From Swiss-Prot:
Acts probably as a methyl group carrier between MttB and either MtbA or MtaA. SUPFAM superfamilies: Cobalamin (vitamin B12)-binding domain (SSF52242), Methionine synthase domain (SSF47644). Residues 94-218 form the B12-binding domain. Can form a complex with MttB. This is Trimethylamine corrinoid protein 2. InterPro entries: Cbl-bd_cap (IPR003759), Cobalamin-bd (IPR006158), Cobalamin-bd_sf (IPR036724), Corrinoid_p (IPR012741), Met_Synthase/Corrinoid (IPR050554), Meth_synthase_dom (IPR036594). It holds the Pfam family B12-binding_2. GO terms for cellular component: cytosol. One of its GO terms (molecular function) is methionine synthase activity. Belongs to the methylamine corrinoid protein family. The gene is mttC2. GO terms for biological process: homocysteine metabolic process; methanogenesis; tetrahydrofolate metabolic process. It comes from Methanosarcina mazei (strain ATCC BAA-159 / DSM 3647 / Goe1 / Go1 / JCM 11833 / OCM 88).
Length: 218
C-alpha cells in the first residue's frame, strides 16, 4: 500500500490532470490507508486546484480546464464525504454559513470548494447554489440567522452585485447581525474594504481560517 505522502501527491495530480476516476480511486485508497481526510483535501485536492487556478490566471489553462479540475475534485470529495459527516457528528457545530455565487454568475467552482472546506471544518453550510438573487441572500439571513453570509463572484461584471448584498442587508436591518464574506477570482482585499465586507477569502483555506478568526472559534 502506498504511503501517506504518495497518496496525497496522487490526489494533487488527479486534479492537475483533470482525472475524475483517479480522484475517486485516490480518495478510496486514502480512506483504506487511514489518511486524514482533511489533510487529503487541503494538501492534495485543494493544492491541485490552486495550481490549476494559478495556471488559469497566467493564461496557460482555460475555463474548460478549470471546470474539469473542479469535477475531479468533486469526485474525490464525494468519496470521503461520508467519513467527514461521521466525524462531524462527533464534534460541535462552529456556526452557520450561508454561501452562494452572486446573481448573474453561473460559475460555482470556488464556491463549491469553500463550502466543502467550511463543512469539513465544522460549520453548518447552507449552499444557495449559483446565480443567486440578492434578495435570496437577504431572506435567508433573516430566516436562518447565520453567523456568516458569503458570496462568490468569478467575473468583474457580477462582482459589483456584492455591493448590493451589503446595502440590502442594511436596508433590511440585519447587517449588524451577520459577518459578510466575499471571494472569487476578481475579488481582492481592497474590494472587500471598499464595499464594507467583513471577510475576504483569497483561497478556500484562507476563507476557513478567516471565518474561524472572525467568529473566534476553532
Amino acid at each position: 500500500m502506498a504511503g501517506k505522502e504518495e497518496i496525497i501527491a496522487k490526489a494533487k495530480n488527479s486534479i492537475t490532470e483533470f482525472d475524475e476516476e483517479l480522484a475517486a480511486e485516490v480518495a478510496e485508497e486514502a480512506l483504506a490507508a487511514g489518511v486524514d481526510p482533511v489533510e487529503l483535501i487541503e494538501k492534495g485536492f485543494t493544492a491541485g486546484m490552486e495550481e490549476v487556478g494559478e495556471q488559469f490566471g497566467q493564461g496557460a489553462l482555460f475555463l474548460p480546464h478549470v471546470l474539469a479540475a473542479a469535477e475531479a475534485m468533486k469526485a474525490g470529495i464525494e468519496v470521503i464525504t461520508p467519513e467527514m459527516e461521521k466525524r462531524k457528528s462527533q464534534t460541535k457545530n462552529l456556526g452557520t454559513v450561508i454561501i452562494g455565487t452572486i446573481e448573474g454568475d453561473i460559475h460555482s467552482i470556488g464556491k463549491d470548494i469553500v463550502a466543502s472546506m467550511l463543512n469539513i471544518a465544522g460549520f453548518k453550510v447552507v449552499d444557495l447554489g449559483r446565480d443567486v438573487a440578492i434578495k435570496t441572500f437577504v431572506e435567508k439571513v433573516k430566516e436562518l440567522k447565520p453567523q456568516v453570509v458569503a458570496s462568490s463572484a468569478l467575473m468583474t461584471t457580477t462582482m459589483v452585485n456584492q455591493i448590493q448584498i451589503e446595502e440590502q442587508l442594511k436596508e433590511a436591518g440585519v447587517r449588524d447581525q451577520v459577518k459578510t464574506m466575499v471571494g472569487g477570482a476578481p475579488v481582492t482585499q481592497d474590494w472587500a474594504d471598499k464595499i464594507g465586507a467583513d471577510i475576504y477569502g483569497e483561497s478556500a483555506n484562507d476563507a476557513v481560517a478567516k471565518v474561524k478568526a472572525a467568529l473566534k472559534v476553532g
